[in-house]
Amino acid sequence: ITTRLVGSEMCIRDSHHPDWEQRLKKMLDMFLQLQNPDGSFPRKFHDDFTVVDGSGGSTPSATLPLVMGYKYFKDKRYLSAARRTAEYLEKELISKADYFSSTLDANCEDKEASLYTATATYYLSLITNGTEHNHYASLTRKAAYFALSWYYVWDVPFAPGQMLGDIGLKTRGWGNVSVENNHIDVFIFEFADVLRWLSKEYNEPRFSDFAEVISTSMCQLLPYKGHMCGVIKVGYYPEVIQHTNWDYGRNGKGYYNDMFAPCLLYTSPSPRDA
């Protein structure tokens, strides 16, 4: 379950599909069964709830649908569970600046853990007030600063004849994935909105300025008629974009790695849209 799934279900009530609401509630209730006493969620598990990977680095991915579930169903159990995730995130990730293992295939520091942590506490700040709101906002800012350390502020050179060089890709504004998976990708989802919100919340224009750099840079490889960027379908965005000599076993620097499925870009509503 992800924010994209929960977000898409936000319109279901108006569309008169109560069966989908019940399915969604069932998934959220299953989430509650998976949560550990310390507030974390396992990274991988079987459908019988047997834990395959108990690493808590993916915990913020659970916060988002729990908050959305609370906003939609008004069930305080989901909000309570979301708050408990934030306690874990603050203690184990944010306070230690140790954002680890959010990507499914890396056991190391990675961008997504900090990116999703910032988004998770952002969601909580949107549905709280006063001291609690301020606390979550502060956590969001700390996590966002760390996430931004993964983003390029220069353009990696490509050799003549490499596809990305021929396309004219500028890496400024793109984020590296992890220490283990040393490539850039388009995985950002709501992070630019988080940065814009932080800019207003703290009167800090650097956040919104860099959100603009990210947003415009991400559009470089979006395929459309007359600008297909080596992709066969309009609207499909390649996920693994190889800007280093890191050996992924396919194509090499300056090309896409077609062993990985492309991401299809779309938008998700936030709690304030509910």
Task: Tell where the protein language model's regions lie, with residue ranges.
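Exposed, low-structure sequence patches enriched in small/polar residues
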Residues: 142, 188-196, 200, 204-252
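Alpha-solenoid helical-repeat scaffolds
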Residues: 4-8, 13-17, 26-30
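Residues within HEAT/ARM-like alpha-solenoid scaffolds
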Residues: 15, 19-22, 57, 73, ...
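Active-site neighborhood of glycoside hydrolase catalytic domains
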Residues: 116, 120-123, 127-137, 141-146, ...
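Single conserved hydrophobic/aromatic residue that forms the stacking wall/gate
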Residues: 1-7, 12, 266-274
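Long, well-ordered core segments of solenoidal/helical folds
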Residues: 19-42, 76-100, 138-158, 209-228
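Core register positions within helices of long alpha-helical scaffolds
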Residues: 65, 69-72, 85, 120, ...
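Carbohydrate-binding/catalytic loop surfaces
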Residues: 4-8, 40-61, 98-122, 157-184, ...
